[in-house]
Amino acid sequence: MDFHLTKEQLLVRKMYREFAENEVKPLAAEIDEEERFPMETVEKMAKLGMMGIYFPKEYGGAGGDVLSYAMCVEELAKVCGTTAVIVSAHTSLCAAPIFENGTEEQKKKYLPDLCSGRKIGAFGLTEPGAGTDAQGQQTTAVLDESGENYILNGSKCFITNGNVADTFVIIAVTGKTTDKRGRSMKEISAFIVEKTDKGFSQGKHEKKMGIRGSSTCDLIFEDCVIPKDRMLGKKGEGFKIAMKTLDGGRIGIASQALGLGEGAVEEAIKYTKERVQFGRRISQFQNTQFQLADMHTRMQAAQYLVYAAAMKKQNHEPYSMDAAMAKLFAAEAASDVTRRAVQLFGGYGYTREYPVERMMRDAKITEIYEGTSEVQRMVISSHLGVK
């Protein structure tokens, strides 16, 4: 696989890096401390096309590619995990499933506003009793007597962008069906929900360990009325759509983890070259050099996995296992590398005077959302034929 970036990719990467350094980094500590969603940053990203990078221009997108999107999330995460996941969830979990599964009318209606950043997107799959077990959905969607609307009842939890989003892709149970072995199972479908829909509400902001500026909340459906033409895909295709959406989402989260780890390495190199102990810069100690060598190597390996998955998705090749491998490795590498960075900083690393403690807190969630590390191992082993 050719990992050489094109001239255009190098240019947009430079733009993302400069934007992250000049516009995102100065606010990162503040939005973490205040648990504040950085709407002003989202508006600036929208003007640069960063909210719809790999969608066609005919739908309002930037007309870029999936690798450019991954690099955008990566560069943002180097300085702010919160801002990175805002773009990832909006793009991979809302705009992407509409683009990949929607009717032409749905794409023309929703994508221009999402790609321009006029509206923010979110995805509702996780429920209080259905996290890793996506088949455990309890939210229902029942066709009303007129046959024109679905009535949704239930709730979703831990929804990224939840309190600020305008457009949601929601997974709900629409009946019962049977599997290939004749066993009864839930029929699951996908819907597009708008913030203004009757019977829909958003819950309180969750107080989190990391990505504290990210809006995370419950979504509540109480006889929520959804026109039937807002079903995404066909009836009963919701589980397939959800799994396909998560495959793409894992590239986004792997990119977030990659950026967090790389950012921690950069901070650690800079600090160890300045910090003096026992009359020497601590970068001169062999232990420090070996630590940094291991940290950089892990993140370089993670980058290859992430870029490979992104390129396979762009080329319309099967990429489910690649996305799972990228997320598994990048997430666990980021958690390890950010922890090591804090250790290299010593007591200062444990304070908020430096960003590495925030990076460590932000990195942990990448091992959990959009499929835990254990789920990624299940996905990978399944593709290997180990069942």
What are these regions (language model features)?
Residues G117-L125, I171:
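A short, Trp-centered hydrophobic/proline-enriched beta-strand micro-motif
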Residues G136-Q138, K198-V225:
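Flexible, small-/acidic-enriched active-site or ligand-binding loops
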Residues E148-Q202:
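A short core secondary-structure module
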Residues G49, V73-A77, A172-V173, V193-K198, ...:
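Short Ser/Thr-interspersed hydrophobic loop/turn segments at strand-loop and sheet-helix junctions
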Residues A95-N101, F123, Q135:
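Flexible, glycine-rich active-site loops centered on histidine and acidic residues
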Residues G129-T132, F158-N161, R181-R183, K208-S215:
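Short Gly/Pro-enriched turn/cap motifs at secondary-structure boundaries
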Residues M1-A89, N101-Q106, C115-R118, G131-A134, ...:
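Alpha-helical interface subdomain recognition
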